[in-house]
A protein has these predicted regions:
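Nucleotide/pyrophosphate-binding catalytic subdomain
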Residues: 1-85
Length: 85
Protein backbone atom coordinates (compact mmCIF):
# COMPACT_ATOMS: atom_id res chain seq x y z
CA UNK A 1 0.00 0.00 0.00
CA UNK A 2 1.39 3.39 -0.99
CA UNK A 3 1.55 6.21 1.53
CA UNK A 4 -0.09 9.50 0.58
CA UNK A 5 0.64 12.60 2.65
CA UNK A 6 -2.30 15.00 2.68
CA UNK A 7 -1.78 18.47 4.21
CA UNK A 8 -4.77 20.66 4.98
CA UNK A 9 -4.27 24.30 5.94
CA UNK A 10 -6.23 26.41 8.39
CA UNK A 11 -9.08 27.37 6.09
CA UNK A 12 -9.45 23.71 5.05
CA UNK A 13 -10.47 22.81 8.60
CA UNK A 14 -12.08 26.09 9.68
CA UNK A 15 -15.73 25.14 9.21
CA UNK A 16 -17.85 22.02 9.48
CA UNK A 17 -18.41 22.03 5.72
CA UNK A 18 -14.68 22.32 5.04
CA UNK A 19 -13.90 19.49 7.47
CA UNK A 20 -16.44 17.26 5.69
CA UNK A 21 -14.65 17.99 2.41
CA UNK A 22 -11.33 17.02 4.05
CA UNK A 23 -12.89 13.80 5.35
CA UNK A 24 -14.18 12.99 1.88
CA UNK A 25 -10.72 13.52 0.33
CA UNK A 26 -9.09 11.27 2.92
CA UNK A 27 -11.72 8.56 2.41
CA UNK A 28 -11.25 8.80 -1.37
CA UNK A 29 -7.52 8.22 -0.89
CA UNK A 30 -8.25 5.10 1.19
CA UNK A 31 -10.69 3.78 -1.43
CA UNK A 32 -8.00 4.36 -4.06
CA UNK A 33 -5.62 2.06 -2.18
CA UNK A 34 -3.51 4.64 -0.37
CA UNK A 35 -2.54 4.77 3.29
CA UNK A 36 -3.06 8.47 4.00
CA UNK A 37 -0.96 10.42 6.46
CA UNK A 38 -3.05 13.48 7.29
CA UNK A 39 -1.45 16.71 8.49
CA UNK A 40 -3.70 19.56 9.64
CA UNK A 41 -3.05 23.15 10.60
CA UNK A 42 -4.84 25.07 13.32
CA UNK A 43 -8.39 26.05 12.35
CA UNK A 44 -8.90 29.35 10.59
CA UNK A 45 -6.74 32.38 9.94
CA UNK A 46 -4.98 34.96 12.06
CA UNK A 47 -7.47 36.64 14.37
CA UNK A 48 -9.89 33.72 14.47
CA UNK A 49 -10.29 32.01 17.87
CA UNK A 50 -8.29 28.82 17.28
CA UNK A 51 -5.62 30.10 14.89
CA UNK A 52 -2.08 29.64 16.19
CA UNK A 53 -1.32 33.38 16.05
CA UNK A 54 -4.43 34.13 18.11
CA UNK A 55 -3.58 31.50 20.73
CA UNK A 56 -0.04 32.86 21.09
CA UNK A 57 -1.38 36.41 21.41
CA UNK A 58 -3.71 35.32 24.23
CA UNK A 59 -0.82 33.64 26.03
CA UNK A 60 1.45 36.67 25.72
CA UNK A 61 -1.31 39.07 26.83
CA UNK A 62 -1.92 37.08 30.00
CA UNK A 63 1.68 36.15 30.79
CA UNK A 64 4.49 38.57 30.04
CA UNK A 65 7.19 36.03 30.92
CA UNK A 66 6.26 33.18 28.57
CA UNK A 67 8.82 30.40 28.60
CA UNK A 68 9.65 28.23 25.60
CA UNK A 69 7.79 25.19 26.95
CA UNK A 70 4.56 27.17 27.44
CA UNK A 71 4.91 28.69 23.99
CA UNK A 72 5.46 25.26 22.41
CA UNK A 73 2.41 23.89 24.20
CA UNK A 74 0.22 26.77 23.03
CA UNK A 75 1.52 26.54 19.47
CA UNK A 76 0.37 22.94 19.12
CA UNK A 77 -3.09 23.46 20.66
CA UNK A 78 -4.73 24.64 17.46
CA UNK A 79 -3.42 21.68 15.47
CA UNK A 80 -4.51 19.23 18.17
CA UNK A 81 -8.00 20.73 18.17
CA UNK A 82 -8.21 20.55 14.37
CA UNK A 83 -7.10 16.90 14.40
CA UNK A 84 -9.77 16.04 16.98
CA UNK A 85 -12.71 17.54 15.12
Amino acid sequence: MKILVQKFGGTSVASQEARIAVKDKVQKAVRSGFAPVVVVSAMGRKGEPYATDTLIKVLKETNLSVNVRELDMMMCCGEIMAACV
